[in-house]
Amino acid sequence: MRSASWTLESSSISLRSTMLSSDEIIRTVEMLKSENLDVRTVTLGVSLRDCAGDSAPEVCHRIQEKIRGQARDLVSTCEQISKKYGIPIVNKRLAVTPIAAVAESLAAEEYLQVARALDQAAAEVGVNFLGGYSALVQKGFTKGDRHLIETIPEVLSSTARVCASVNVASTRAGINMDAVSLMGKAIKETSLRTADRDGFGCAKLVVFANMPEDNPFMAGAYLGFGEPESVINVGVSGPGVVKKELERAIHSGKKLTLGDLSEIIKRTSFRVTRVGELIAREVAQALGVSFGIVDLSLAPTPTVGDSVGEILRCLGLDSIGAPGSTAALALLNDAVKKGGAFASSSVGGLSGAFIPVSEDLNLSEAVRQGHLSLEKLEAMTSVCSLGLDMIAIPGKVDANTVAAILADEMAIGVINHKTTAVRLIPVPGKDVGEKAVFGGLFGEAHILEVRNLNRSAAFVGFGGRIPAPITSISN
């Protein structure tokens, strides 16, 4: 049962500054009690830039000492503050400096030692996941970048908590197609190495365009080079809260337009964001580190009533993937951003609505029923906060086709000046109509059909870099 000691008076955020009426305070309490509102993740960013060295044992020792020193109290502090306010904090995580930079001087075979040191340190401090086995290669590779990408499959198949991410494109640099090709192969090999778990290793690997430096969500979190020595970034949740508010308004009998529904989502996002910032500032103050950002993203779970898909159904869609799905998602994403931006001046990360298929019951069911295709999901990613996320595809899909899917999604991000990402899971030995089970927050996914296999090899094989887009001619 949640603690009754949850009070706004004890926080540094006064009632006057929140501009909340008594009714809105009551609604916030209801959101916590019965509508699945939680803080999805408190992520501590830790700089490892001072951990570089000439040998793997030296680097590993420095990394472990740094993480133990910075993060030893993270979990206990989060639990204390969760109890104080009665607000669940689901995950406690770490994000570190991109390891490609930290381990630059090491040989490729030594990167696995570094990854295992990260995994051990994460286990010792009690966090769920550690992000930052990462490289930024949108314009080209360093030696360390290549070593890191080469070792991703082995690292993700032999560690429990380490997550990997690679930025292969940006609006200013274009798309590094050599990196895209390598990541297609890395995804396939990671899948094969974790075939006994339905390719689960790929759930810890994200390929990005315009990768944010302060994202608290896994598997794409890392500590950017412009970030402080250590910093708290928080990701809130709340699809269930938004759904309940929409249902309450729709069932009131009033004549509502989509503009009215957008306003309801906006007000709800405001309340959710205030809760997230309260927790973030309290944790940062208790740990003596900087407060960074609140990520506004509506992150679903496999739990009934905690689904972005259910929100789209509330907005009038009989099936997710039907005509109108992209417009409904655009409405939701924009309203969430507007409400959150009004609630906090420290909004960052991804901030919008996620559509991770395996982690959302309604999206997964839409795939099973044949209503939601890969092509429709790609269209929807042009207006939401992330991309093709947690999508299980047949194990027979070749590496070049995977790379071509990556390239398509990167192009959406590059041209539209937004973050896009791909987390595809080729499931070895399974095909359309079968199901992959990942467990926990990762949920389960019905295998999605990928059409036109083995028809993109020549395109991917050209390699090189797709140039950055012109910005003066906006159409």
Stretch-by-stretch model annotation:
Residues 15-475:
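Anaerobic metallocofactor- and corrinoid-dependent redox/one-carbon enzyme cores
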